Regions:
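Small-polar-interrupted transmembrane alpha-helices in polytopic inner-membrane proteins
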Residues: 145, 177, 181, 210-220, ...
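Functionally important transmembrane alpha-helices
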Residues: 281-343
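Transmembrane alpha-helix boundary signature
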Residues: 114-121, 146-162
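Membrane-interface helix/loop boundary segments of multi-pass membrane proteins
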Residues: 187-215, 221-226, 236-262, 294-301
């Protein structure tokens, strides 16, 4: 990543003592480290502790190790169902997301200890009015998804079927799916808008961002085929010119937007493995990831994004019973089905695969900026250094 401090310069040799004077006594600590030692230290450490690139690499390795260990334990405890990838029940979703969340939290906590940060809240969770932003995010997520469903129904691209649940089951499955999607929100936002967005912001520039995104696109070209990959390519290309202009103009806060370009593209990338995803759905995942980055910038934390993400998924999967990234849940309240042209209905991808989702995401972004954009949250730039203890 971009150097955070300049490499140390060789120190001048001390003057010889005058005749008749005793040479000053020096302790071992008075002697400077050999250049080789200081050079190695500079490679790994910057003014804010562990450099961003090494921090991200450590985080990725730890999260993979923790997820593997937890997955093995949960499987042995028979908490993950039959192991069928298409099994989409509230209990399986809850425990699967619990693995991801615990692995992410454990990895972030260990990296935080290495970086001497005071708590996990240092990663874009410290901002003002946290609970207000969280609950307003819940409202925004449900309202945005409802607007999308309403638009699809109005256009004749979605039909409502019978209500699938009744009595106590409505509350039972509603609560179970709410718990599962809260974990989804905490895991995915915790990974992308909290840890990665925070860490990349303190150590990235345009060329590093371009290199990361180029590597992601090369990986797709070499290993993954299908329609969905074009969503990643499209979003990566969309961010290229704005980020380059920010770079050449040396705009304040440029690193935040370079990081947002990277984390949002990666967010689209991880959704390619979902069942039934088309390129619109992948592009929409990256686009909503960018909206969540904007929410971090204008509210001062990721709490709005966590709430919005959880409520969007809950409304889509449980309340309306639509496919979520190609998966239809067991135990949903309403029943809906796509009708007509896949570009408008979303087909097997669900509402997120419809062109209408891009309009809804755009409106959500406009509303977010209109409501919060003129307010001044706690500075994210100062938050980069504040949590580090000496």
């Amino acid at each position: 990543m971009e150097p955070e401090i300049q490499p140390p310069q060789p120190e001048a040799l001390p003057a010889e003592p005058a005749a008749g004077e005793d040479a000053p006594t020096k302790s071992i600590s008075d002697f400077p480290d050999p250049w080789e030692t200081r050079g190695v230290r500079w490679v790994f450490l910057g003014s804010q502790g562990l450099r961003a690139g090494w921090s991200v690499a450590t985080f990725v390795i730890l999260i993979a190790l923790f997820a593997t260990a937890l997955g093995f334990a949960f499987f042995k405890l028979h908490l993950l169902g039959s192991g069928n990838k298409n099994e989409f029940t509230a209990s399986v979703a809850f425990f699967s997301e619990a693995i991801s969340f615990l692995a992410m939290a454990g990895a972030a906590a260990l990296v935080g200890l290495i970086e001497r940060r005071r708590s996990l809240l240092a990663y874009n969770l410290i901002g003002p009015r946290r609970m207000v932003h969280f609950f307003s995010g819940l409202v925004a997520g449900f309202a945005a998804l409802s607007a999308l469903i309403g638009g699809l129904a109005w256009g004749g691209w979605l039909h409502f079927g019978p209500i699938a649940l009744s009595g106590a089951e409505v509350f039972k499955f509603g609560a179970l799916w709410a718990a599962a999607f809260l974990l989804v929100g905490f895991f995915e936002e915790g990974t992308f808008r909290c840890y990665l967005q925070f860490t990349l912001t303190r150590g990235i520039n345009f060329w590093w961002a371009l290199g990361i995104i180029g590597a992601v696109c090369l990986e797709l070209v070499l290993t993954i085929k299908g329609n969905g990959v074009w969503g990643v390519y499209a979003f990566a290309l969309l961010g290229l010119l704005p980020c380059f202009l920010l770079h050449i103009r040396k705009a304040p806060g440029s690193a935040f937007w370079q990081a947002a370009w990277v984390t949002s593209t990666l967010f689209g990338f991880i959704h390619i493995s979902n069942n039934g995803e088309n390129w619109i759905g992948i592009f929409a995942a990256a686009a909503i990831g960018f909206v969540f980055c904007v929410s971090v910038r204008v509210t001062g934390s990721a709490w709005w994004a966590i709430g919005c993400h959880a409520a969007w998924d809950w409304a889509e999967t449980y309340f309306f019973g639509a496919a979520d990234s190609g998966n239809v849940a067991t135990g949903h309240y309403l029943t809906t089905s796509p009708v007509g042209n896949v570009l408008w209905s979303g087909g097997t991808d669900g509402p997120e695969g419809s062109l209408l989702v891009l309009a809804v995401i755009s409106l959500l972004l406009v509303a977010l900026v209109a409501i919060y954009g003129r307010k001044k949250p706690a500075s994210l730039d100062s938050a980069l250094t504040e949590p580090v203890s000496g």
